[in-house]
């Protein structure tokens, strides 16, 4: 099922975009499309341009293959792909009970704003036809970096979620 949805689904999505002359696709995936356990456990300032290492998790592998399919389609077709990597969506008004805030957290409103920005960004301003962005709020531990989303999309998260990391 993971390959049918994530890998074949990416192929079908990109084929439909090319067939119907859609020039902008926003694809989504979990952060471990790029940064599996081998990165996540040992590194900091992980940015979306690192070499992909999704690890051995089936879901992460199938999403990573889907991302590669998107990239290949951009190389020979008039289509741009913006891939947004997410992990944990939070309502800033809900208490976080019995768990810590994950390093890749974002409010629903800030996530929605990232999509608006991706739909409005001038495609000629992007470095390539396939760009990957880490989408999360500014967090103090700096395990991951969202600087690329800020600089290329103008992303500026409003919900700090500081009530969960300011204990």
How would you name each of these model-derived features?
Residues 29-30, 67-92:
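Conserved beta-loop-beta element that borders a ligand/cofactor-binding pocket
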Residues 130-156:
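Conserved C-terminal active-site "lid" loop/helix of NAD(P)H-dependent oxidoreductases
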Residues 55-59, 97-108, 123:
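Glycine-rich "substrate-gating" loop/helix at the edge of Rossmann-like oxidoreductase active sites
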Residues 161-167:
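Amphipathic terminal alpha-helices
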Residues 71, 86-92, 105-129:
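Alpha-helical substrate-binding/gating segment
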Residues 4, 40-75:
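Catalytic helix-loop patch of NAD(P)-dependent Rossmann-fold dehydrogenases
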Residues 12-53:
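Conserved Rossmann-fold NAD(P)-dependent oxidoreductase catalytic core, especially the SDR/UDP-sugar
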């Amino acid at each position: 099922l993971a390959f049918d949805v994530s890998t074949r689904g990416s192929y079908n999505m990109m084929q439909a975009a090319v067939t119907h002359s859609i020039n902008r696709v926003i694809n989504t995936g979990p952060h471990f499309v790029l940064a599996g356990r081998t990165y996540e456990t040992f590194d900091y300032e992980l940015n979306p341009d690192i070499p992909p290492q999704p690890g051995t998790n089936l879901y992460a592998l199938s999403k990573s293959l889907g991302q590669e399919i998107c990239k290949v389609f951009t190389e020979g077709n008039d289509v741009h792909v913006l891939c947004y990597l997410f992990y944990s969506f939070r309502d800033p008004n809900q208490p976080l009970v019995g768990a810590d805030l994950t390093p890749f957290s974002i409010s629903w409103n800030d996530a929605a704003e990232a999509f608006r920005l991706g739909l409005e960004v001038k495609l000629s301003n992007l470095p390539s036809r396939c760009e990957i962005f880490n989408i999360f709020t500014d967090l103090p531990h700096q395990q991951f970096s969202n600087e690329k989303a800020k600089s290329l999309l103008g992303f500026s998260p409003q919900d700090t979620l500081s009530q969960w990391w300011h204990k």
